Amino acid sequence: MGNPDIPPPRFVVDKLCEVARKKHVHGYSSSRGIPRLRKAVANFYKKRFGVELDPEGEVILTIGAKEGYSHLMLAMLSAGETAIVPTPTYPIHYYAPIIVGAEVRALPLPMELEEEEFQEEFLRRLYEVYNSTMPNPKVLVISFPHNPTTITVSLDFFKEVIKFAKKNELWVVHDNAYADIYFDDYVPPSILEVEGAKEVAVELYSLSKSFSMAGWRVAFAVGNEILIRNLMRLKSYLDYGVFTPIQVAAIVALESDYSVIRNIAKVYEKRRNHLVEGLSRIGWKVKKPRATMFVWAKIPEYFTKVKGMDSLEFSKFLLYEAGVAVSPGVGFGKNGEGWVRFALVENEMRIKQAIRGIRKAFRKTGFYDAGG
């Protein structure tokens, strides 16, 4: 489970406690977010991505990215309309449109292609899915860096997506939850960096991973003013926003030095290195991700072809025989079959322990005798 074990920055927790002691904050807040927080989001986007946002009409606070995304689908889609969702995917991306009565067309991700080839094939499949669906889809849902596959894309990729969306009158919703958990020489862009993107796109940004504030339920939807105002109107009937002290603490987080975020990402980078290199040493070759807090691993062929295991059976095997919990790929859709997802939410000693457990479990099955 992608539930960070790293605590939030101490100064953010201190601010929460300080404000929570004040009597006047214990009441309903604003569903759209207090003005200072929306301004802090706009300033953060300017510094981080070079994107200009109007705090009044292009920024809204959401009670976590899942809530924001789900209600955005409710604000955008009606029965009989269709969303395109790449798969495998974070489950709510696929099911929120269905919950609101819309249809979903899956776009299988070409997971094993390198970035340039991935971009070309993704766009080819997007064109194919869009044009083979009648009436044409209304929304494209994307998320890069991607959960669970850890796929990353360039700004050029977003340019092509926006170009396609404008040409075909398609809305784009981009979940940018892992924008700040990146490694090596890669820096994830925002889709709103594309000129004219706000004409067709909304982006979700969360503090859960960037500031290790999972459970605080603080996220934002930013971008197209029509969609943001529709979401504001909908949420005004549904909720009273996030507890005010949490909003004030979020302001402090967003206004802090970016090194705070990078220090959190460096912890995940070290864990990534230990896990991927450890798996490689025991004969399980896994691609090293450039972003997210996950490792997406293809199950060795010995287990799928010789032992006949699917991803759920293999996950149970690792749990019972190695004492290691992973997410079966099928849990992210049928296109995730044959893969498992590791979450980098344990320290380096625990990761080393996990590698030893997996090696022992592999040995019991005859994996190494078979040349694994």
Predicted segment positions?
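Conserved PLP-anchoring active-site segment centered on the Schiff-base-forming lysine
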Residues: 75-97, 124, 128
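Active-site phosphate-binding strand-loop segment of PLP-dependent enzymes
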Residues: 109-184
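Conserved core segment of the aminotransferase class I/II
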Residues: 193-194, 198-269, 273-282, 361-362
